[in-house]
Amino acid sequence: MIWFLAALLALMSADPTAPELAQALQKKYDTVKDFSADFTHTYEGGVLRKQITERGRLTIKKPGKMRWQYTAPEEKLFVSDGAMMYSYIPQDKQVIRSTVPPDDEATTPALFLAGKGNLTRDFTASLVELPAGMAAGSKALKLVPKTRQQDYDWLVLVVDPATFEIRGLVTVDAQGGKSSFSFTNLKQNVGLADKDFAFKIPRGVDVVSASPRS
């Protein structure tokens, strides 16, 4: 707790540099064991050439467990039990499963939230303007992965500078598509159970195993 108060006082006394904010954010999330939040996800541009807005509920438990439950406009479910990841869209009647990468290979934004990877080790940080639609008073930290990623070119974390809570997440992929997540009703260290991240493959669906990425 002493380090957290010291970091907070330092950041309140002057505008933090990008490395200082990244380090403080990493230390904050090292103390968070689980959390939940409502989310709004907007995707625009890229291969779809249109804007889509979806909503749902996110729950995460370290290390590596997460559940993205999309509820509108279409039901979708993305689950990681810490060892395997599952993607399920009921309308498609298909489950895609893959293994969770090791910590030193996990720079996917969602996996950082789940305690995989490390901001100061895996990314180069810089401060940028606050993305449109994000909460006023937040700080925007742009993170460029030091190792090239297939899913995205860079990401922006939107952070509450007083609490270091993540209010939003923006990623841009190689096709120019932008995914923006905004988080509300965030609750931390509530004692989520492992069973909340178990996934049972529904009957009558096709199961596809995704190949490991090189």
Give the residues covered by each predicted segment.
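An acidic-aromatic
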Residues: 57-108, 179-180
